[in-house]
Amino acid sequence: MKHSLIILISFLLLSSPVIGNSHKGETLYRWGECCDWAWKGFGDKEIQPKYQGEVENGKPNGLGVIIYPDGIWKGGDKYVGEWIHRWKNGQGTFTWSDGGEYVGSWKNGTRWNGTFYDKNGNIIYKYVNGR
């Protein structure tokens, strides 16, 4: 949980126009089935995952947050971190609504090098090169 706080604070500082890059964040909604998604500037946060953050060519790229609604994941599951061309890439934290979280690096949307914690902060699994 401590790791999520560090990443969240870093994200907020980097996204601040005074401290970080003054790039304006955008809101996108993910449409479609895995993994043939389309990202659109309109949608319903009750149905589609909602992304807020940096965008390039109409896709998440840079720092951003995505929150998943009920029906796809349990409502409130979210990812905070880096994106490259629509995929989670780089450092980030995925937090499940039950309090569990994965903290570490991502590669092409896959957990890569990091740690999965339960809701009490106990280590459940360590990922190395996606395994």
Feature-to-residue mapping (PLM):
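Sec-dependent N-terminal signal peptides
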Residues: 4-14
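Glycine/tyrosine- and acidic-biased, solvent-exposed loop/turn segments at the edges of beta-strands
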Residues: 15-131
